[in-house]
A protein has these predicted regions:
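Conserved pre-ATP/AMP-binding loop-to-beta segment of ANL
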Residues: 53-55, 171, 181-202, 208-209, ...
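ANL superfamily adenylate-forming
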Residues: 63-64, 149-194
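Conserved AMP-binding A3 loop
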Residues: 67-72, 191, 198-222
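AMP-binding/adenylate-forming catalytic core of the ANL superfamily
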Residues: 127, 134, 144-147, 290, ...
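Conserved AMP-binding/adenylation subdomain of ANL enzymes
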Residues: 221-238, 245-289, 303
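Gly/Ser/Thr-rich phosphate-binding loop
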Residues: 260, 287-292, 301-360, 372, ...
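Conserved ATP/PPi-binding loop(s) of AMP-dependent carboxylate-activating enzymes
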Residues: 381-412, 448-450, 544
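AMP-binding/adenylate-forming catalytic domain of the ANL superfamily
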Residues: 477, 510-532, 551-570
Length: 571
């Protein structure tokens, strides 16, 4: 018999599935399920998985090797893993650093930790030893689970931790393979309370000390019902989410959301993202739902999409705004619309374009079921343009518990009437939100407010541009002027002629106050989740302007007299 909590969880899920294309009714009727106790892995996953021979997990690598597990195999393996962890002394509330690539053991251990009541702290395999030491110390992590390729980085910094290696035996580490000898049945240490901790994320942002975001057994497992409504997944789907472990989006779309409806999680492991191979894999494996960050979509449209007869039904994107031109190119080739969604590590999906609704290219969408979202100005008043802010009364299930170890920051974020995302947007007459930028990305030039995203959207439509980031460059007369940092498409040379052509095209397209006055062809520094580190670009720009120097492939509008009546000094 299902638990009362599971019954309520499934009733809320089923309402969203029943109205998956009826936005107004879903918004009107959905309520977050009320429950005091709930363990998503025990109360939902195990009953769904028992005797279920459908693929729950399907991993393919670029060499063609495949491995898969049925839902029932995952249920049993995670039970063994939970018993194994308990045997090693892991208890409810203990924090586990899990530093694994996309391999089967990752999912077994994520389920096991939830069943046990331990707290998962997913980490990318790219972290340095200094990063790991910071996480272990500030996060009070007691258990380290790592890939063999990562073990050396824990030397001298994890001596007090339980250390488990997945993949091969390592001196001083317990081999995860030993879990195979433990019992197939698992009995929990009592009930799991909804407010018990479940996941601890270190934000990928651009500061040297990432914030620690704490989620509960309710906020992510239950909160992702809003994400389910946005993604539009259904039982039997094969869902491919282009994401790496350690990023919150991995938990969104490679754990909770697909398995909440019994969809297959599909993984394509490759050393470097290859658009042609990825597209071929989509076709060969019959993927029905694809969610990818903008960087991946921008790479995919460089291929001739019409050559790939995909069987996709749902296309989604999150992480950063997607330029309308990308959406148009995909629509022209496949007849499918990429539907954008918006959320944060601190939340589940709060805004989005769900299936069956009119999509306005480039829009973040509208509030998703369970969320009320408003735009607030600097005085905290409702505005047509302002900070994207979640109404906290009633509090959505998907909002984080706190910033762990930082009571003051938590109070500022969650102690008032709204949770502010630090993202700025505008809203149109039909309730669609439009991204403007991070609160620290938007700048003024000659007293005009500049949204980098608007300029980047124009740049990405130029035939020579693959990717772009617009930042402010210090200017004596205007305070700041827009500068474009550009990655060119393959085969395009980073010459003065290319710079002239792009600047001229932007001059013809943009308003005079938006004019891009500097362009540099360069790499774009990114976080492990693929977000551009604009703070690094800004810091370098400030140094150069103060020193009166320029980059090797940096061009100013003053270099091209035909583009301006008053050339600007080039250094």
């Amino acid at each position: 018999m299902p638990t009362e909590a599971a019954t309520r969880f499934h009733a809320a899920r089923d309402l969203l599935l029943a109205h998956r294309t009826d936005y107004d009714r879903a918004m009107a009727e959905f309520r977050w399920p009320e429950m005091a106790e709930f363990n998503w892995a025990l109360d939902h996953f195990d009953p769904m998985a028992q005797g279920n021979a459908q693929k729950g997990l399907w991993i393919v690598d670029e060499g063609g090797h495949e491995v898969s597990r049925t839902f029932d195999e995952l249920r049993l393996a995670s039970n063994r893993a939970a018993n194994f962890l308990r045997h090693l002394g892991v208890r409810r509330g203990d924090r586990l650093l899990v530093m694994l690539p996309n391999r089967v053991e990752l999912w077994e251990l994520m389920l096991a930790a939830i069943k046990l009541g331990a707290v998962l702290s997913p980490a990318t395999t790219l972290l340095s030893q200094a990063d790991l030491q910071d996480r272990i110390e500030r996060g009070n992590l007691r258990v380290v689970i790592a890939d063999p390729s990562c073990c050396a980085r824990f030397g001298g910094i994890a001596d007090g931790c339980v250390r488990i290696v997945c993949g091969s035996a390592e001196p001083g580490w317990t081999d995860y393979a030993d879990s195979a000898g433990h019992a197939d049945a698992f009995a929990p240490d009592g009930p799991t309370r909804c407010d018990d901790p479940c996941m601890l994320y270190f934000t990928s942002g651009t500061t040297s000390k990432p914030k620690m975001v704490l989620h509960s057994q309710r906020s992510y497992p239950v909160g992702h019902l809003s994400t389910l409504y946005w993604l539009g997944l259904q039982e039997g789907d094969v869902h491919f989410n282009v994401s790496s472990p350690g990023w919150a989006k991995h938990a969104w779309s490679c754990l909770f959301t697909p398995w909440t409806v019994g969809a297959t999680i599909f993984i394509y492991n490759q050393g470097r993202f290859d658009s042609a191979k990825t597209l071929g894999t989509l076709v060969r494996c019959g993927v029905s739902s694809l969610c990818a960050p903008p960087t991946a979509w921008r790479s995919l449209i460089l291929e001739d999409l019409t050559r790939y007869p995909v069987r996709l039904r749902e296309l989604t994107s999150a992480g950063e705004p997607l330029n309308p031109e990308v959406i148009e190119r995909v629509m022209a080739a496949w007849g499918l619309t990429i539907r954008e969604g918006f959320g944060q590590t601190e939340s589940t999906a709060m805004l989005g374009n769900p299936p069956g609704q009119p999509v306005r290219y480039g829009s973040m969408g509208r509030p998703l079921p369970g969320y009320r979202v408003e735009l607030l100005d600097v005085d905290g008043k409702s505005a047509r343009e302002g900070e994207v802010s979640v109404v906290l009364s009633p509090r959505p299930a998907g909002v984080m518990v706190a910033y762990a170890g930082d009571e003051e920051r938590s109070r500022r974020a969650l102690g008032g009437s709204h949770y502010g995302t630090a993202d700025v947007a505008s809203i149109d007459d039909d309730g669609y939100f439009w991204y403007v930028g991070r609160t620290d990305d938007v700048f003024k030039s000659s007293d005009y407010r500049i949204s980098p995203f608007e300029l980047e959207s124009a740049l990405i439509e130029h035939e020579a541009v693959a990717e772009a980031a617009v930042i402010e460059s210090p200017d004596a007369r205007r305070m700041f002027v827009p500068k474009a940092c550009v990655i060119l498409k393959p085969g395009v040379q980073p010459t003065a002629d290319t710079a002239r052509a792009i600047l001229a095209a932007m001059r013809a397209r943009l308003a005079p106050y938006q004019k891009i006055r500097i362009i540099e062809f360069c790499d774009l520094p990114k976080t492990v989740s693929g977000k551009i580190r604009r703070t690094e670009l800004r810091a370098l720009e400030a140094q150069r302007r103060a020193a009166g120097t320029r980059g090797e492939l940096e061009f100013f509008e003053g270099d091209f007299p035909e583009l301006t009546d008053k050339p600007r000094a080039g250094g």
